[in-house]
């Protein structure tokens, strides 16, 4: 394994900080080792980005776009190798990591279109002059990436930031350093000038050094609510720096009067258990009516979820669920389930840690209807809380009884119920009769409350990657036709 794991000012360097490693959570094997970037190396990365900023932002947009498009082409050339790297480091099945790489490619054209539509140049009519609205890059921005989509989600910040003319210092999750290294090598192959994109690998100390660097102009973060809140506090009193936070959710999914039970169950499974429940949009709470139909749906759901195939990412017969990101994460889900049981929850399908040393768990469903003080927690794994209800409005109110507000959904045949639900539910992603995990890069992605800070990403990422500049212009200074009162020339 190479120890040259930091990419600073166009050079691969060994880290000068503490050693750390990455494990394949499905096979319990160390697959990456390196030393973290020291505070001095983080400072060097920021300085390199600052030095490269004017050169990069002064380049014609078409030149920047040519490099970004070349990156998209190279993603296609390296798609299978990159998909395998993501699978090895996250435990996700290959069928899913292949879709992640495809989403990374698709993000390029979407980001170019969003940049043009949302942050392009507009000329407004004005007598005696020209009026323009243009957009400028912020400068040096830090990007913090998560582990669940270690390619696609940081890509969703990095690509629009570079298109806009920013330079970037990227701090990936310490759980997925191998994916980050592979991404940077593809960018390097695409011909990105030195200093434009820098990689600082490491754990908490590296992240703190980057977030606290006084010379960054902004920080774009996707990850846990806990870390996002820490960053928000760290940036307090710095209104000149832009902070874009995309965090988690305690997402409600309500079922009411469905005619196709299997169709509803499929949407629930896709909402709660895809990616082993490790999507920020995954449903954490399922509301089902107390009725004969509701009983039938719950029974069918338990049957289907109990048959979900869990297995190795590279198995010939692909599983629906792979391993969670780590054994620690898997054991955390076991403990979360135990805590809900202590509070009065009844497991309908018990989540079980399947193999010591790995992130493999079976999916779980727990009825928490009887729990009077349900914790407002994002259980980031395949554990679905079931709540039975009698009144639709009360279910919506309970769905809104969370500090989060990322995603929500209704499964039901009545359009009137859908319209009512849409008006009342508080979330940034609200779906009807579709899984709540299928967000599109061609739409804004973000939430309210503890799920974000009103800086929606995906298609709206262009908005936080550049700031608007209004200009009134004429070719020369000239006397007006009429002077203001009190002036003599």
Swiss-Prot record:
The UniProt annotation places NAD(+) binding at 223-228
Q: Which terms in the Gene Ontology molecular function aspect does this entry carry?
A: succinylglutamate-semialdehyde dehydrogenase activity
Q: What does this protein do?
A: Catalyzes the NAD-dependent reduction of succinylglutamate semialdehyde into succinylglutamate.
Q: What is its EC number?
A: 1.2.1.71
GO biological process annotation, one example: arginine catabolic process to glutamate
- In Swiss-Prot or TrEMBL terms, this protein is called N-succinylglutamate 5-semialdehyde dehydrogenase
Q: Top-level EC class, please?
A: oxidoreductase
UniProt lists the family membership as follows:
Belongs to the aldehyde dehydrogenase family. AstD subfamily.
- Catalytic residues (positions): 246, 280
> Any transmembrane segments, and where?
none
Catalytic activity from the UniProt record: N-succinyl-L-glutamate 5-semialdehyde + NAD(+) + H2O = N-succinyl-L-glutamate + NADH + 2 H(+)
Pfam families referenced in this protein's UniProt entry, alphabetically: Aldedh (PF00171)
Write the record's keywords in alphabetical order, separated by commas.
Answer: Arginine metabolism, NAD, Oxidoreductase
Organism equals: Aeromonas hydrophila subsp. hydrophila (strain ATCC 7966 / DSM 30187 / BCRC 13018 / CCUG 14551 / JCM 1027 / KCTC 2358 / NCIMB 9240 / NCTC 8049)
Gene label: astD
Instruction: Cite the annotated pathway.
Output: Amino-acid degradation; L-arginine degradation via AST pathway; L-glutamate and succinate from L-arginine: step 4/5
Q: Which InterPro entries match?
A: Ald_DH/histidinol_DH (IPR016161), Ald_DH_C (IPR016163), Ald_DH_CS_CYS (IPR016160), Ald_DH_CS_GLU (IPR029510), Ald_DH_N (IPR016162), Aldehyde_DH_dom (IPR015590), SuccinylGlu_semiald_DH_AstD (IPR017649)
């Amino acid at each position: 394994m190479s120890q040259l794991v930091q990419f600073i000012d166009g050079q691969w360097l060994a880290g000068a900080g503490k050693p750390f490693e990455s494990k394949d959570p499905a096979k319990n094997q160390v697959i990456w080792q390196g030393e973290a970037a020291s505070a001095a190396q983080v400072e060097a990365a920021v300085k390199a980005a600052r030095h490269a900023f004017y050169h990069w932002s002064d380049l014609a947009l078409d030149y920047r776009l040519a490099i970004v498009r070349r990156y998209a082409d190279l993603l296609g050339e390296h798609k299978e190798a990159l998909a395998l790297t993501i699978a090895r480091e996250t435990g996700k099945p290959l069928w899913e990591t292949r879709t992640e790489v495809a989403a990374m490619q698709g993000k390029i054209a979407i980001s170019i279109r969003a940049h043009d539509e949302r942050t392009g140049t507009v000329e407004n009519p004005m007598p005696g002059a020209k009026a323009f609205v243009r957009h400028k890059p912020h400068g040096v921005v830090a990007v913090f990436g998560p582990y669940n989509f270690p390619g696609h989600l940081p890509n969703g910040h990095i690509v629009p930031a570079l298109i806009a003319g920013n330079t970037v210092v990227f701090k990936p999750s310490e759980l997925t350093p191998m994916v980050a290294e592979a991404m940077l090598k593809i960018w390097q192959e695409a011909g990105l000038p030195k200093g434009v994109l820098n990689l600082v690998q490491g754990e908490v100390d590296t992240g703190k050094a980057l977030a606290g660097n006084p010379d960054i102009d902004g920080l774009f973060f996707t990850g846990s609510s806990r870390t996002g809140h820490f960053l928000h506090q760290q940036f307090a009193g710095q209104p000149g720096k832009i902070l874009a936070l995309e965090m988690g959710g305690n997402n409600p999914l309500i079922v009411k009067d469905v005619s196709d039970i299997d169709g509803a169950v499929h949407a629930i499974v896709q909402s709660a258990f895809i990616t082993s429940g490790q999507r920020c949009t995954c449903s954490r709470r399922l509301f089902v009516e107390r009725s004969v139909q509701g009983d039938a749906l719950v029974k069918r759901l338990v049957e289907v979820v109990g048959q979900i195939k869990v297995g190795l990412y590279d198995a010939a017969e692909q599983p629906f669920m792979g391993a969670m990101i780590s054994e620690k994460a898997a054991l955390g889900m076991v403990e979360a389930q135990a805590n809900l049981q202590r509070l009065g929850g009844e497991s309908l399908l018990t989540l079980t840690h399947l193999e010591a040393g790995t992130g493999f768990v079976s999916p779980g469903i727990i009825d928490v209807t009887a729990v009077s003080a349900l914790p407002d927690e994002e259980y980031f794994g395949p554990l679905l809380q079931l709540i039975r209800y009698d009144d639709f409005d009360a279910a919506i109110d309970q769905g809104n009884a969370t500090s989060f507000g990322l995603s929500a959904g209704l499964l039901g045949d009545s359009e009137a119920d859908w319209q009512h639900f849409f008006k009342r539910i508080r979330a940034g992603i609200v779906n009807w009769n579709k899984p709540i995990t299928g967000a599109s890069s061609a739409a804004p992605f973000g939430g309210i409350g503890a799920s974000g800070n009103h800086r929606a990403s995906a298609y709206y990422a262009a908005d936080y990657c550049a700031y608007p500049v209004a200009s009134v212009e004429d070719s020369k200074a000239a006397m007006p036709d009429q002077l203001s009162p009190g002036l003599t020339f």
